[in-house]
Amino acid sequence: MINLADLCLVGLVLAYSLNLAPMMFESFTSDRIWASNPPDSFHMFLGQYGQKTAHYWRVVSPLAAMTFILSFIFNWHLVDRMFWLFAALALYVAVQLATIAYFVPEQEGLIASAPWLSRDVLQARAQRWILLNHFRNVAGLLAYGFLMCALLARSQAL
């Protein structure tokens, strides 16, 4: 029979997957497109029908944070899981902070300043964004791996 600690952890893996999968999808599809030929490639974000994903992230990111909290509350007494949960949380927070502090503002800034910046500057900054995004993706995948380790760890209490 599944207990509440296990159920919270399964919910966390699901909620985290709703964060990780689109992040990876964007990295391999739309991110490569918008960074391919700035400023022309920025058109995918412009206009009435431009791509806007903020509404998705405003729902999914808090859901993952909430399930992290619930998982900590209900798994606190399970020593074999806590290390993995802390490691996953640290990477999740690092990815979220990097996204908030650099990735979103830089992308929005590039699009907004496209009329004033040279193609070379736009291209260099877009390529730097893509390069740094690889590290963000690795951190996201590692966090997922740590969550799977927590899920597979024994449910042995302190």
Q: Each predicted region: which residue ranges?
A:
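Internal alpha-helical transmembrane segments of multi-pass membrane proteins, especially GPCRs
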Residues: H55, F86, Q127, H134-N137
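Interfacial segments of alpha-helical transmembrane regions
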Residues: I2-S17, I73-A94
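Mid-bilayer segments of alpha-helical transmembrane spans in multi-pass integral membrane proteins
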Residues: V93-A101
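Core segments of transmembrane alpha-helices
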Residues: V60-S71, N137-G145
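Hydrophobic residues within the alpha-helical transmembrane core of Major Facilitator Superfamily
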Residues: S17, I69, V93, G145-M148
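Juxtamembrane boundary at the C-terminal end of a transmembrane helix
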Residues: A150-L158
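Structural signal for membrane-spanning alpha-helices in multi-pass inner-membrane proteins
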Residues: M23-E26, F68-N75, T99, L147-L151
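Interfacial loop at the N-terminal end of multi-pass membrane proteins
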Residues: A5-A64, P105-Q127
